[in-house]
Amino acid sequence: MNETPNTRMAELFNAMVDAYETWAEPLSARLAQVALRRTTVSAGDCVLDIGAGTGALSLQAAALGASVIAIDLSSAMVARLNQRLAPYPECKALVMDGQALTFEDCTFDAAFCVLSTTLFPKWSAGLDEAVRVVRPGGWLGIVPWANPEGADIFTILSRALKKLPLPTGSPDAPKLTALMSAHELRAALEARGCEVTEVDRLDAPSQLPPPECFIYR
């Protein structure tokens, strides 16, 4: 099987479901909470969560009474999220590429990309698709990283990796440079016909494990 950026990304996240849910989801959940509160999403709305992971935004939207469809490239993430969405019969998670959504135009009242858009090989395609599937007057919440290596801990890890004798050809940590600045994000959304209501920088705490269990599989 030929390896593509999508399959590499899926394999990466398939291998870290437990660690992601424990250590990464609390940060994503805080950002998702802020994004949801800045919209009018409520019971009965149809919400799309793009790059949903283990459900940081999906679970909060479901608790509001929204009908949520969550998508992710990682089949393991999707399986975990479907387990967690079981109490919400109107909600489900699907394996799908956010750069090529299979939904009709104007399907959703709101769509969210929390820390996922900049992971796409073609973030512009992902943004195009998110805009396409939201109805006129609906909500689109985009939460990119505000620095090129993501959370502060990733900066520390990146520096540490550079000091290790890694095998030839080992990939570098991805640079999450797309949509970092408020100006760039606003311009990208306005170019796609969106009325931008707010663009803010948010600092949120990131929970870290103790050193003895920091890296595990």
Question: Which residues does each predicted region cover?
Answer:
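Conserved class I S-adenosyl-L-methionine
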Residues: M1-D45, A56-Q60, M77-R84, S158, ...
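C-terminal helical/coil "lid" or tail adjacent to the Rossmann-like core of SAM-dependent
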Residues: M9, M16, T197-R217
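Class I SAM-dependent methyltransferase SAM/SAH-binding core
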Residues: C46-L101
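A short acidic, Gly/Pro-enriched loop at the edge of an enzyme's catalytic core
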Residues: Q99-A111
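A short SAM/SAH-binding and catalytic strip from SAM-dependent methyltransferases
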Residues: A110-S124, A146
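A short glycine-rich, Lys/Arg-flanked "PGG" loop and its adjoining helix->strand segment in the class I
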Residues: S124-W139
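Conserved catalytic/acceptor-binding region of the Class I
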Residues: W139-P209
